[in-house]
Amino acid sequence: MQQHDICILGAGPGGATAALHLASKGIPCVLIDKAVFPRDKVCGDALSGKVVNELKRIDPGLPALLGKQKEQLPSWGIHFISPAGHKLSVPFKPDYDAAQDVPSGYISKRIDFDNFLIEQVKQRPEITLLEGIGIAKVERDAQGYTLTDKSGEYQVSTRLLIAANGAHSTFARREAGIEQEPAHYCAGLRAYYKNVAGLDKDNFIELHFLKDFLPGYFWIFPLPGGYANVGVGMLSETVSQKKVNLKKEMLRMIESHPEFKQRFAGAELMGDIKGYGLPLGSKKRVISGDNYMLVGDAASLIDPFTGEGISNAMISGRWAATQAELCLQQQNFSADFMRGYDKAVYNRLWKELKLSRRMQQLLDYPWLFNQVASKASKNKALAETISCMFTDLDLRERLKQPSFYLRLLFN
């Protein structure tokens, strides 16, 4: 049996980030994943400015290195299309120059981005990376936890377990008591298409809020090589209540909706349409306990409005590494001491998650969404205000005040 002070279960962006920050502190760990990289992960594939900032925190040179990868596209903004068909184009940076400026966001398939992080992991002697090992049992022991693989031949004992093993983490459910709640869980479908027409020249991602699909949304994200990530998302609660067949609805919109019919006329579906679940951060949860912390999707930290989870996984991975260092320094792995991790994560993310929840709920009022999109599409100053929302939390805070919308509607 191997013994390690710190074991990280799951080598996606959250787990890899935790391992890399530990390595920077000179702290060894073992990082285990059931897959062998590169491996696919069903996702929207968009990397926000927050992801770029977290890469900088790992190593200031990483964003430039990512920018050199042929498997990514720089993205300069988002097109929001309202239920009434108003297009609100929100650049990540006002008055950007795509030829000169450093991109604020990227689009990269998870098979490529996750492997990009794993390549950084492999360069760090402090990290023992174990791929292709499916952990079947996680049991409490006197020191912390013992993990056993499916064959029963591989075992590791650890004083501190960082569970970063995704939306379907058995450990998060059994040990931390995190249940899948339809009101705080999103069902998503993702497909790859080739030759979708009308993609933005600066690779803006598209979020369509279609009248006959609310409160769900339809997305199109451009990818290298003429590909696009195309998908839909809707709260599981709504899917259940309205008995929505997401795949049927997605194909119906692609084949017959006036917004998409011509754009997909010459497009080809590449591979299968795949489903996935998004545990949303619209509710505060206890994400640590005796000898463990939960990171990323295992901690239910996905943004309820945008559906983005990579940046929050990386942020929680960074704070898990900080807490792990304190645990080793103090030789304290108790639940009480571990609460410092919960506090740090929610200090950073809760305002943002709470606000995104409110914005998600605005989709129940399409008339208001239409008014905002219509006004902003004709008002450069207002469009820039909304643009800053993606980087300036104080500004996002203003957007939840009813007076902001009243001024918007009547000025």
PLM region spans:
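Beta1/beta-strand and adjacent pyrophosphate-binding region of the FAD-binding site
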Residues: M1-G12
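Glycine-rich FAD pyrophosphate-binding loop
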Residues: C7, A23-C43
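N-terminal Rossmann-fold NAD(P) dinucleotide-binding loop
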Residues: G15-A16
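A conserved beta-strand/loop capping segment in the N-terminal third of enzymes
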Residues: K56-F113
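Predominantly flavin-linked oxidoreductase catalytic cores and closely associated redox partners
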Residues: Q120-F260
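FAD/FMN-dependent oxidoreductases across multiple families
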Residues: Q155, T238-Q323, C327-Q329
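C-terminal helical "tail/cap" subdomain of flavin- and related membrane-associated enzymes
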Residues: E325-N411
